[in-house]
């Protein structure tokens, strides 16, 4: 997937939602290249737009630490405007903390497009505002084409990037919440 674009489209939407800028939290996993690319794209989109990163939360392997750390950030900062999450499991933890703190005025962005985050987006829960989505189905189809070419000793593209796109409340029904797009 074009991970950088997945983060970029989230940042572009944040510029629309919060045109005056604001304070943001970034939930990342520095050891994971795809997450790094997503965060880079997001930060490129919001550069020089009045946003201040007030906290970076490093998600550990299964992201289980994110909820506790986000809860602490919320208790220490009354003016968080948005949270950018490098993946949907991170976003699920952030949304849980935001819901418990009753701070649903915070815009939450994520990358993936899992059924759980699309459901939160559709229902307007946990602050979920938008998803830089990828399509595991299309990624699988491309992998099969490459494998078939390899087995047949034919030429193939060595680098394949699947298009990423933005899902929000206006178009989430088109993608559904019962599976991946």
Identify the role of each PLM range.
Residues 19-23, 48-54, 78-81, 103-107, ...:
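Loop/turn elements at helix/coil->beta-strand transitions in domains of secreted/extracellular proteins
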């Amino acid at each position: 997937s074009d991970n950088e674009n997945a983060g970029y489209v989230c940042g572009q939407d944040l510029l629309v939602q919060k045109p005056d800028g604001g304070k943001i939290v970034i939930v990342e996993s520095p050891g994971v290249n795809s997450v790094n690319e997503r965060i880079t794209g997001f930060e490129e989109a919001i550069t020089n737009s009045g946003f201040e990163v007030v906290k970076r939360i490093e998600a550990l392997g299964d992201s289980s630490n994110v909820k506790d750390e986000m809860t602490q950030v919320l208790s220490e900062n009354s003016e968080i405007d948005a949270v950018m999450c490098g993946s949907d499991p991170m976003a699920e933890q952030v949304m849980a903390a935001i819901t418990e703190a009753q701070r649903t005025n915070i815009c939450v962005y994520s990358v993936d497009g899992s059924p759980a985050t699309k459901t939160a987006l559709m229902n307007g829960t946990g602050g979920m505002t938008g998803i830089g989505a990828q399509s595991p189905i299309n990624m699988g189809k491309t992998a099969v084409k490459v494998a078939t070419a390899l087995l047949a000793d034919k030429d193939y593209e060595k680098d394949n990037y699947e298009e990423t796109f933005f899902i929000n409340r206006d178009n989430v029904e088109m993608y559904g919440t019962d599976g991946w797009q």
